[in-house]
């Protein structure tokens, strides 16, 4: 694999703009090569024209560049790199190309100008990130002081006077100038040059580099100073307060109606330890990514300079790489030292000194694709197609629809099985979304907050959906077979129980506590669903409101679940007739069920409005309130009919549809920006074909309008009406799948613009500094 592809693959998606523009530099080199090639072609033709005249004096003369034989002697005269000092001890590099007067020199000058821009950009980004992690390390020092003090207090409650000594490696000097961050040991650049000499494949080299953490060396003075740092236990405990890192409805209500401060218990300390483990793990991943960022950029500079030497026939690589080696990204050793400190601290305090167990937590294994997943996905999809054909043939061969009871029979069982059809279609759309997110490098695992190594890929989701499809079609086929079998005429209620058994199996798999069938993903879904149901008592995160939006597209599935409760709970299956609409309670819940998803999203928006104080959440809440009104009026029309209800349903649905469509395209997708680089789209697009975005907007409008068709009076039979309702519900699920891709694309681009590549894990302890005390006074 070429380095350009490996370089792109190894990038942190949210930091793409901060990397060396390797492809841009290659384009400049192509211009230089094209010019050199045309120059050599002209020179060769000139030589051939003079061949006869020169033949009598010089036999076999060939063209040679004038100064090529002495290129090695004038290497130092090709470029001159100056350092410009800026405020805050920051350095900028400026390269002067000394051969500008030569023919084609302006191309090479533009190459070095672009190279300097990339070097300065990379150094600036690296400097800012190193400053950020050093400050974060200082905060983690205070968190560890608090944890150790609380552990001692819990083990020995009577001890008040105890000095906590810090490990020599815990000393951190928060000085982010270029001079202090640069050390004598240039481990990264030495490693890069070693890889260049040994010809190790770049992809393998990047993994080697990420796994090696050089041992930092601390001078004697620094070590002596840090050993002398001692803190009193009582002083620390007086400054520490436990944060509510694991929010629950109880803690939320306590925060609203009273003081949530409570004495720290052993249970609370245990939760704090678990939270601090997550903080250290996330911090370690950030350090590793920063180390990989440094290494890959150094490798990119080395590769591009080798290409320049080959194309321009100039030996400028050594001089320029010396500058790169001495720059911040090539010489700073702060990240390596922090990596070592985190490993030592984590192993000592969170793994009982067991380094192997500690490193397993800090470096979770990368998830590998399994061939059996692909095999069973194909197997189940093939079985699903075969079962669909079998169902169609069964209905046709028994001529069910031509019999008197056939229509009524299908009208009874189709709503029951449609629940599973909606779920399967939704999962298939989610599988397609994951495939395209991965293809266009949308970091969906970070956006959703999935734990590394446990996230489901597109093939796993496809496997689950096709497996459920096989199960549903087998049950449906079995239902048909038993109903039509003359031997079962005395046990007519037995086939009616099959949909209930299928629903029980699905619920058992979903809530199964054993570590089978992707337990971590199932529990993540259950937790997000519970947060949605308990809105606004939980802090609203992206997975929560994303799931809430998807629930609004599953109104018909929720109503099918309500039908399950009525059909089996009230004993309707014993009469083999669906008369649930004759029950007043069912009709009341028929209203409520349609409103619940929108109401939950409304409450989530109100919670975010109160916390973030941003007006956009207020407008979003208004949008859901209008949708709630439209759904209520439409449901009332569906039950009561009448021209007045029809007009009210059309007006309310039209207003809600218009606002929802505008919100989808402009707010959620970030499109229709009139003055953007891409007219009527947005500045940054991940999909290279602009027509895809315009097509998606048109399809979204059409499918948004489709649900209004339910308001119109078609005078359809019961079965046909069920079919139309199911088709429109399927179209809404497809629309939601399309919406999901562009919604996460826009979220990813927002993260890219802010270089936000890691989730912020809340610290378990709040440590009061002297500055905080002064502010309180």
UniProtKB/Swiss-Prot annotation:
Name the record gives this protein: Phosphate transporter PHO1 homolog 10
Similarity section: Belongs to the SYG1 (TC 2.A.94) family.
GO cellular component, one term: plasma membrane
Limits of the SPX domain: 1-322
Species in which this protein is naturally found: Arabidopsis thaliana
Membrane side Cytoplasmic: residue ranges: 1-372, 430-459, 518-646, 713-777
Tissue-by-tissue expression: Expressed in root epidermis and cortex, leaf blades and hydathodes, stems and flowers.
Induction: By wounding, dehydration, salt and cold treatments, osmotic shock and infection by P.syringae pv. tomato in leaves. Induced by salt treatment in roots. Induced by auxin, cytokinin, abscisic acid (ABA) and 12-oxo-phytodienoic acid (OPDA), but not by jasmonic acid (JA). Induced by Pi deficiency in roots and leaves. Down-regulated by sucrose.
Topological domain ranges for the Extracellular compartment: 394-408, 481-496, 668-691
Single GO biological process annotation from the record: phosphate ion transport
Boundaries of every EXS domain copy: 581-775
A Pfam family per the record: SPX
Highest taxon of source: Eukaryota
Alphabetical UniProt keywords: Cell membrane, Membrane, Phosphate transport, Transmembrane, Transmembrane helix, Transport
Function of the molecule: May transport inorganic phosphate (Pi).
């Amino acid at each position: 694999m070429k380095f350009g592809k490996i370089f792109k693959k190894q990038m942190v998606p949210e930091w793409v703009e901060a990397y060396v523009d390797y492809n841009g530099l290659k384009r400049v080199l192509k211009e230089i090569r094209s010019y050199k090639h045309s120059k050599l072609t002209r020179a060769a033709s000139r030589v051939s024209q003079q061949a006869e005249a020169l033949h009598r004096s010089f036999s076999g003369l060939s063209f040679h560049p004038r100064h090529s034989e002495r290129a090695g002697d004038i290497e130092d005269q090709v470029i001159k790199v100056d350092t410009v000092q800026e405020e805050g001890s920051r350095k900028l590099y400026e390269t002067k190309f000394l051969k500008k007067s030569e023919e084609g020199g302006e191309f090479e000058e533009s190459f070095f100008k672009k190279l300097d821009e990339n070097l300065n950009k990379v150094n600036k980004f690296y400097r800012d990130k190193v400053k950020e992690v050093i400050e974060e390390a200082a905060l983690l020092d205070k968190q560890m002081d608090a944890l150790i003090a609380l552990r001692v207090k819990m083990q020995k409650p009577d001890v008040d006077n105890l000095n906590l000594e810090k490990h020599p490696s815990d000393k951190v000097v928060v000085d982010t100038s270029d001079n202090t961050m640069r050390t004598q040991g240039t481990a990264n650049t030495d490693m890069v040059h070693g890889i260049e000499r040994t010809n190790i494949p770049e992809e393998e080299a990047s993994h080697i580099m990420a796994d090696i953490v050089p041992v930092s060396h601390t001078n004697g003075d620094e070590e002596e100073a840090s050993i002398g740092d001692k803190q009193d236990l009582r002083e620390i405990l007086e400054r520490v307060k436990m944060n509510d890192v694991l929010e629950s409805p109880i803690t939320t209500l306590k925060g609203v109606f009273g003081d949530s401060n409570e004495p720290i218990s052993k249970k609370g300390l245990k939760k704090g330890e678990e939270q601090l483990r997550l903080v250290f793990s996330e911090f370690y991943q950030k350090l590793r990514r920063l180390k990989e960022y440094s290494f890959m950029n150094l490798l990119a500079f080395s590769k591009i300079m080798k290409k320049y030497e080959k194309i321009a026939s100039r030996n400028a690589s050594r001089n320029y790489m010396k500058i790169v080696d001495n720059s911040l990204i090539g010489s700073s050793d702060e990240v390596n030292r922090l990596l070592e400190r985190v490993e030592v601290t984590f192993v000592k305090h969170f793994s009982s000194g067991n380094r192997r167990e500690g490193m397993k937590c800090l470096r979770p294994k990368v998830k590998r694709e399994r061939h059996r997943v692909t095999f069973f996905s194909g197997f189940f999809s093939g079985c699903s197609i075969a079962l669909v054909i079998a169902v169609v043939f069964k209905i046709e061969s028994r001529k069910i629809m031509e019999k008197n009871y056939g229509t009524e029979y299908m009208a009874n069982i189709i709503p029951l099985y449609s629940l599973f059809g909606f779920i399967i279609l939704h999962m298939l759309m989610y599988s397609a979304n994951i495939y395209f997110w991965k293809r266009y490098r949308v970091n969906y695992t970070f956006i959703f907050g999935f734990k590394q190594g446990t996230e489901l890929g597109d093939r796993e989701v496809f496997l689950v959906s096709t497996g459920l499809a096989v199960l549903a079609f087998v049950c449906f086929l079995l239902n048909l077979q038993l109903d039509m079998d003359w031997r079962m005429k005395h046990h007519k209620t037995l086939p009616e129980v099959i949909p209930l058994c299928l629903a029980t199996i699905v619920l058992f798999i979903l809530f199964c506590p054993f570590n089978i069938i992707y337990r971590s993903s199932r529990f993540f879904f259950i937790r997000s669903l519970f947060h949605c149901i308990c809105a606004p008592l939980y802090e609203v995160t992206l997975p929560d409101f994303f799931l809430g939006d998807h629930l609004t597209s599953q109104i018909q599935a929720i109503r099918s679940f309500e039908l399950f409760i009525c059909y089996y709970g009230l004993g309707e299956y014993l009469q083999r007739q669906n008369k649930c609409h004759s029950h007043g309670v069912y009709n009341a819940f028929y209203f409520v069920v349609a409103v619940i998803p929108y109401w939950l999203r409304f409450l989530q928006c109100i919670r975010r409005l109160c916390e973030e104080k941003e007006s956009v959440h207020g407008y979003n809440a208004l949008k859901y309130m209008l949708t709630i009104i439209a759904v209520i009026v439409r449901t009332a029309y569906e039950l009561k009919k009448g021209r007045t209800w029809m007009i009210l349903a059309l007006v309310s649905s039209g207003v809600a549809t218009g606002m929802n469509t505008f919100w989808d395209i402009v707010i959620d997708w970030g499109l229709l920006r009139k003055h953007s680089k891409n007219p009527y789209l947005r500045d940054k697009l991940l999909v290279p074909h602009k027509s895809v975005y315009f097509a998606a907007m048109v399809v979204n409008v059409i499918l948004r309008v489709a649900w209004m068709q339910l308001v119109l009076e078609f005078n359809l039979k019961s079965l046909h009406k069920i079919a139309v309702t199911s088709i429109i519900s399927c179209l809404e699920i497809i629309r939601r799948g399309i919406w999901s891709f562009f919604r996460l694309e826009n979220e990813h681009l927002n993260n890219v613009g802010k270089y936000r590549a890691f989730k912020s894990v809340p610290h378990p302890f709040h440590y009061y500094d002297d500055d905080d005390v002064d502010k309180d006074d």
